[in-house]
């Protein structure tokens, strides 16, 4: 047996030697390789698949949609972590969660956008601290006592506070709105945290916020991401949805973004998400605010500001729906299709094609034929939309 194995090995050595000699013979008479004699060699296919590549191939992992206790809804349900905590966790540090647990990622993220809601940003930290001006309002004082009692009483307070804000019964004299001391402080906290933890080449801490349009309960939310540092981001406070200082119309958000760029020379983009909760108005062919057909200007403007779409996150997957893709066995993945965001209106089948990314791409091609521009040409990403201050998806 050993003799047979040795014989086989010997044949392998002989075959290798012959191949090498043939390769050498093939180059006999050719000049020594140098830059000046490159043309003297026979043209041949690159032996390296990486030769000639001049595009980026690195993949970076992160989250472009995270809420902390600065967000009105996150704070109402007990989130105590703030932007500094969020960036520390994303960079791989161990932090204490709002429930008192020690938490740490198995591997640090490469980037993070803390995207707290622009409406009423920073209100809850002030409530938790017992801001005397806020507690002078009887309703707010009652909420403060309920929150401090804890348990189901605190949960009831959270629901009551959110409903009051959405239904217009919130004591707005206590609200945190652009121009108020509370709001300015909250925005400065967000900017300072991003500046502190941004480390070029190691970790990117993006400045951002979420513009939370929810007219009639229909979701048109966008995460606004700055491509700038704190010096420019601090020039204008975030845009909100409450009139007269804000608006729920995406066109007005885009005007605000243009104003920011004109004023600062900076750059930004918006990332829409959760069309599945829009009840047919995320990717429409008519303006849901005017009921007029879109024109070329709309298509150009939307394409300019919204090159990405957040296709999946905690509130359901937004790529497609079983009724839109009946032959796709994965179309029912994480489907959330009962109604709009606050379930004030039920879902109808005819709404679906205007809610999901795949059908939106088809609609965009149709609009391009009519308008000459495709408003729904976008890349797709996934984010968490976590409201705990912790970007925990891995």
Where are these regions (language model features)?
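Extended, charged catalytic domains and RNA/DNA-binding interfaces, predominantly
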Residues: 26-394
